[in-house]
Each structure stands twice: as C-alpha cells, then as structure tokens.
Curated annotation (Swiss-Prot):
Principal EC category: transferase
Role: Specifically methylates the guanine in position 1835 (m2G1835) of 23S rRNA.
Database matches in Pfam families: MTS (PF05175)
The protein's name in its UniProt record: Ribosomal RNA large subunit methyltransferase G
Species this protein is from: Salmonella agona (strain SL483)
Listed EC numbers: 2.1.1.174
Length: 378
C-alpha cells in the first residue's frame, strides 16, 4: 500500500493482487504523476479517456470527471475498483471498457500509459484515431527506458505530429496532435500456422507470443496427458493452444479457457471456432482473476503456463494466486500441471501448497511439474 498526492487528490493505492511486505511494489509510478501535472482542470472538456491505468492511479485522481478506463486487463479493472472503494470514491464514477470496444467520440483528454507491447499500443491508437479530434489533448507516459524511437514513430504514423518531454523522475511523456495522416488498414488479428496440426492460430494484439508458438508452450504440448474426462482448465489460456491440444487429446473432457485478458479469451474462442468447431460445445470461456468465484472441487485437472510479470513489473504473485486457486477448485486427486522457467523454483512452491510435487519433464530451460490435490474434502 502506498500514498500519493498528485495535485488532484491525496490517495492511498495498493496493487492487485497485493505484493508482500518484504518485496513491496508500488501501485503507481512517476509517469502517473507526470501525466497529471500536465492537466489544468480548467482545460478538461469532453470525455476523459484513460488507457492502461494499471491500478487506478489516474482514474482515482480524475474520478470527478467521470473518466473512461480502457485496457485489456481484468486485474487492472479489479485493482482500480478496489482503490476507488478504498479512497471513498464511487465505482460508478469510472466507466470500464476493454480495448476492442468502441471508444467515446470527441474526447477532450486522452491519457495513455504506454503498454509493454507495440502491438497493443497500435491497436489502441488505431481505435483512438476513429474518435479523437485536432482539439483532443493526447498525452502518453512511461518510464523513460520504455519509450523508444519505434514508440514515437507509431504515434506519428497513426495519429500525427509527436514530441517528447525531458525525463522527470526517470519518466517521460509523449505529446501528440491528431492530424489524420494517411494509414493503411490492418487486420484485427495476426494469424500463423501451428506446425504438425493443420491449425491456424489467430491472435489479438495483446496476446502473449502472438507472432508464433512460444517455446514453453511447445514443450508443454509435447507432454500433455490423454484420456482425461470431466472438466479441465487452461488457466491463463492466452491464445488457447494448450486448451486446443487438450480438446484434441481428450475427446471426453470439457475445457474451460480462463484468462484475465479479454483479448486472450476472445482469441481462444476464435481458435476453437475455426480449428475445432465440432468441439466448441465442450468449451467454456471465462474472463477472470485466475479462478476467483469458481466453486471448489469442480475440476479434474488444471493446466497452467503462469506469468512471472505484471505489465512491466516482475512478480510471482499472480502465479502464487493461480496455484492456490487451482488447489481450491480441484477435486480430490485432481491434478495441476504447470510449465515454467527452471530458475523460478515453482517445485517448492507447489510442494508447500499441495504437499507434493513431481517433475514430469525438463530441458535446459523449462520444467513441467505436476501436483495432486490430496486429503479429505473440506
């Protein structure tokens, strides 16, 4: 939990999920302060759009202007809602939209936290291009190290003339004026053939490893079990390649695709529809914070390639939460399978949570682990 006085409000903010007290990470950064410093309240006219507001620092500060918070993270939405409540601000003061929704027309101010991937930034800038005007004030911010020549060129290409500020507290801003430059259309998804399957995998802008199969998933797919039945989960599904493989290998099973990214869940749905349409009735698609709110003792197996970062920050909090949720939602003797980088030492974490852990396969970079839910039903 951290305190910030940004000139608009004095706020107490926390990350979601919360980090431990030993290795605390802040819920805001200098770029948030720097962005807010640029705004004279008298100049805010028309809708306020805030893109990629990780934990609500900008949305909370500008809540009286009824901003729209736009992004591709359900965790960020939950974190923003939690911080609104914690600071006594009505949740209804902020309207939440995912990045693929239609944006409000003629915004007065657009504040952008530059996302980690250029693909998501381009998708968002193209969406903004449809609604901004020459009078819209467009400001983006990030750590100085995360703003590159390619970032500036993208703003120029999609929206118009772009300048940058000096660094302040290691943060930097981008100012952009819309001039409606000529721009060729771009497809909504990036597609590629998945080797040895005949499948075409479709990826929205913010999907992990959208340009090809990541090496961890490739290794995982080589060791997925067969002949499972009941309900099984692709947790943190991304584009759904693990779930697709599970559907193909386990014709008696139902697969639940879960991710906190709406773009990921939509990519998974699209990939089942186009590659295994006959299996679509055996699928469920869920935008969620891991398995929050899912009833206990529901699943026979959970499969997970857990992230070890949240936006630009390195953290194992999300993976830790996924493992705990998996244990709660597995049936007795249900199994959790994960693939992870060897250096993350998830073996001992799983053993602490489940009381057991076995190594299924390993190579020079990755390890596949299995933990079994034991004990009596509680």
């Amino acid at each position: 939990m951290s305190h910030v006085d940004d000139g608009f409000r004095s706020l107490t903010l926390k990350r979601f999920p919360q980090t431990d007290d030993v290795n605390p990470l802040l819920a805001w950064e200098a770029a948030d302060e720097y962005l807010l410093q640029q705004l004279d309240e008298t100049e805010i006219r028309g809708p306020v759009l805030i893109l990629n507001d990780t934990f609500g620092a900008l949305s909370c500060a500008l809540a009286e202007h009824s901003p729209y918070s736009i992004g591709d993270s359900y965790l960020s939405e939950l974190g923003t809602r939690e911080n609104l409540r914690h600071n006594g601000i009505a949740e209804s003061s902020v309207t939440f939209l995912d990045s693929t929704a239609d944006y409000p027309q003629a915004p007065g101010v657009v504040l952008i936290k530059v996302p980690k991937t250029l693909a998501l930034l381009e998708q968002q800038l193209r969406a903004l291009r449809k609604v901004v005007t020459a009078q819209t004030r467009i400001i983006a911010g990030a750590k100085a190290r995360d703003i590159h020549t390619s970032t500036l060129e993208l703003f120029e290409k999609v929206l118009g003339p772009t300048t940058t500020t000096l660094a302040w507290k290691k943060a930097r801003l981008i100012n952009c004026t819309f001039s409606h430059p000529q721009l060729a259309d771009a497809p909504q998804t990036l597609s590629w053939k998945l080797e040895d399957t005949g499948w075409t995998i479709h990826n929205h802008a913010n999907v992990f490893s959208r340009t090809g199969l990541d090496i961890g998933a490739r290794f995982f797919m080589q060791h997925l079990p067969e002949n499972l039945d009941g309900e099984i989960v692709d947790l943190g599904c991304g584009n759904g390649v693990i779930g697709l493989s599970l559907l193909a290998k386990n014709p008696q099973a139902k697969v639940v695709f879960v991710d906190e990214s709406p773009m990921a869940v939509d990519s998974s749905r699209l990939n089942v529809e186009t590659n295994l349409p006959e299996a679509f009735e055996r699928c469920e698609f869920m935008i969620n914070n891991a398995l929050s709110g899912v009833e206990p003792f529901r699943f026979n197996a959970v499969f997970c390639n857990p992230p070890f970062h949240q936006k630009h920050a390195l953290t194992d909090n999300i993976a830790w939460e996924m493992f705990h949720h998996a244990r709660r939602c597995l049936k007795i003797n249900g199994e959790l399978y994960i693939v992870a980088n060897r250096h993350l030492d998830y073996f001992h974490k799983l053993k602490k949570i489940f009381g057991n852990c076995a190594t299924i396969a390993t190579n020079n970079k990755f390890v596949i682990l299995k933990a079994v839910k034991q004990g009596r039903r509680r």
